[in-house]
UniProtKB/Swiss-Prot annotation:
Reactions mediated catalytically: L-histidinol + 2 NAD(+) + H2O = L-histidine + 2 NADH + 3 H(+)
One Gene Ontology cellular component: cytosol
Gene: hisD
Descriptive protein name: Histidinol dehydrogenase
Binding site for Zn(2+): 262, 265, 364, 423
PANTHER family: HISTIDINE BIOSYNTHESIS TRIFUNCTIONAL PROTEIN, HISTIDINOL DEHYDROGENASE HDH
């Protein structure tokens, strides 16, 4: 029987092995930066001509003009109308729940009125134009379209652009249907680093955007990293991952399937179980092997779970939680007797799934919170994609005459200390 790599916190070599595990998110972008930089430069200097050439090279069809890259909204409408009723119902259910959750996130403008007549506050404004990158082809994910588009819609973004690779010029019908559901009219058959560059810098036919969000391969991730500063981005994400905290009460068949739910995404995905129960660990090994036999993506899942997966035996649940905080997984399932009791101790995770009836896939599709999450330990400082990614804040200041007289001399003193005479005089002129 094959077994998932196992670490035990009581062994001398544990720290070394655990530190190696923490490097799971390290992706060597250095090898692809020259290629991606070249593609970006071509888009910046050649515009649509470069886009057409890149589509011909990478997606294996030959558009004659930039007009052919844009998908007619009527095709999206037709794709939506062609959906079977149950699938349309599922998409609408997902849309409504995602919209409801992200509406609760939306920040509000505010003003604070001081006694001396001074007004301070914050104005929250949506971005003018957002670019969504959605992987395409046979592996197109309409759920990714919903998760990226709906926060932008809730934020109030007026113009939403979608770029998606379309091999052999065959758009994914389900993705087109999801675009229609979201009311998106501007969809381009462009993928990879070329799409990121086009959205960041603009071409003759594709106007530049203010923020780019969405998942992609290492070329897409590298391109997003390189154009950051020209535009805002959501995050630089790597392969998918799941961490599971479990005690002896967890059901081994469920734990096994939950680990495999991420392993089937990608050979580079990480699936990690941390538990104080050796009995559970042994049972999960058996159940993983059993489940693999009936999975369509057995080859990918098997390679992922046995080369990138791990089971960590902790001395108790306190240590298990501490180790999981170091891992800071993209998805964290808490399969213990009292999951909410451990919630205050969990500090670092993209999304936290509490209880045995909350498997990670429910968050991928229908729960409501966003499934675009920080990976590779970046949950220590990054947050999930949210409505706020599509909004920006401006500070508001309005001083009354009394207000500036009360604070002006303090301001002038600080400006003088920093040697900025014009700053000082600008304030003092109003105190005469």
């Amino acid at each position: 029987m094959r077994k998932i790599k196992r670490l035990n916190s009581s062994l001398a070599e544990f720290r070394r092995e655990f530190d190696e595990l923490l490097l799971r998110g390290n992706v060597d972008m250095d090898t692809v930066i020259p290629v991606v930089s070249g593609l970006i430069k071509e888009i910046r200097t050649q515009g649509d001509a470069a886009l057409l050439a890149h589509v011909a090279k990478f997606d294996r069809w030959n558009p004659k003009s930039a007009m052919e890259l844009k998908i007619d909204p009527s095709l999206m409408k037709r794709a939506y109308e062609g959906l079977e009723a149950s699938l349309r119902e599922a998409l609408h259910s997902a849309y409504n729940r995602i919209h409801s959750f992200h509406s609760k996130q939306k920040p509000q403008s505010w003003l604070d009125f001081e006694e001396n007549g001074t007004i301070l506050g914050q104005k929250v404004t949506p971005m003018d134009r957002a670019g969504l990158y959605i992987p395409g082809g046979k592996a197109a994910y309409p759920s990714s379209l919903l998760m990226n588009a709906i926060p932008a819609i809730v934020a109030g973004v007026k113009e939403i652009v979608v770029c998606t690779p379309t091999p052999e010029n065959e758009p994914n019908e389900l993705l087109l249907a999801a675009c229609h559901l979201c009311g998106i009219k501007e969809v381009y058959k462009v993928g990879g680093a070329s799409a990121i560059a086009a959205m960041a810098y603009g071409t003759e036919s594709l106007g530049r955007v203010d923020v780019i969000t969405g998942p992609g391969n290492i070329y897409v991730a590298t391109a997003k990293k390189l154009v950051f500063g020209q535009v805002n981005i959501d995050m630089v994400a790597g392969p998918s991952e799941i961490g599971i905290l479990a005690d002896e009460s967890a059901k081994a068949p469920w734990v096994a399937l939950d680990l495999l739910s991420q392993a089937e995404h990608d050979e580079m995905a990480s699936s990690i179980l941390v538990t104080p129960s050796v009995e559970l660990a042994d049972a999960v090994d058996v159940e993983v092997e059993r489940a693999l036999e009936r999975l369509d993506r057995k080859e990918i899942s098997s390679k992922s779970i046995y080369t990138r997966g791990a089971i960590i035996i902790a001395k108790d649940m306190n240590e298990a939680v501490s180790l999981m905080n170091e891992i800071a997984p993209e998805h964290l399932e808490v399969l213990v007797e009292n999951p909410f009791g451990w919630l205050p101790e969990i500090r670092h995770a993209g999304a936290i799934f509490l209880g045995e009836n909350t498997p990670e896939p429910i968050g991928d599709y229908i729960a409501g919170p966003n499934h675009t999450l920080p990976t590779g330990g970046t949950a220590r400082f990054y947050s999930p994609l949210s409505t706020e990614h599509f909004m920006k804040k401006s500070s508001i200041l309005s001083f009354s005459e009394r207000g500036i007289r009360e604070l002006g001399h303090h301001c002038a003193k600080l400006a003088q200390t920093e040697g900025l005479d014009a700053h000082k005089e600008s304030v003092l002129a109003r105190l005469v």
